[in-house]
Amino acid sequence: MARSTKKGPFIDGHLMVKIEAMNQANDRKVVRTWSRRSTVHPDMVGHTIAVHNGKKFVPVYVTENMVGHKLGEFAPTRTFKGHAAKTESSSRAR
């Protein structure tokens, strides 16, 4: 179920304050955040936001196509190492 349109998109307050301050100062620093739940706002376009994935911060350069998505969608939390390789003992007939 999607969020109600009358509420508007959720953006953590501390993150929006940093983005607005950088926009007014015309500054483009990397903003580190743990807020994966925040929605990408049009004011964030052009900024690089380092989103925490549980282990490290993944730099995400925000483009217009990302508006409306969550920041966590662009910082994967799981790494797939591949399925186990076939061994001689596993392929032997029983």
Swiss-Prot record:
Keyword Disulfide bond (UniProt): no
Any GO MF annotation of the entry: rRNA binding
One matching Pfam family: Ribosomal_S19
Cross-referenced PROSITE patterns: RIBOSOMAL_S19 (PS00323)
Keywords, sorted A to Z: Ribonucleoprotein, Ribosomal protein, RNA-binding, rRNA-binding
InterPro entries for the chain: Ribosomal_uS19, Ribosomal_uS19_bac-type, Ribosomal_uS19_CS, Ribosomal_uS19_SF
GO cellular component assignments: cytoplasm; small ribosomal subunit
Signal peptide, first to last residue: none
One of the protein's GO biological processes: translation
Keyword Ribosomal protein: yes
SUPFAM superfamilies: Ribosomal protein S19 (SSF54570)
Function: Protein S19 forms a complex with S13 that binds strongly to the 16S ribosomal RNA.
Family: Belongs to the universal ribosomal protein uS19 family.
The protein's name in its UniProt record: Small ribosomal subunit protein uS19
Organism: Acidobacterium capsulatum (strain ATCC 51196 / DSM 11244 / BCRC 80197 / JCM 7670 / NBRC 15755 / NCIMB 13165 / 161)
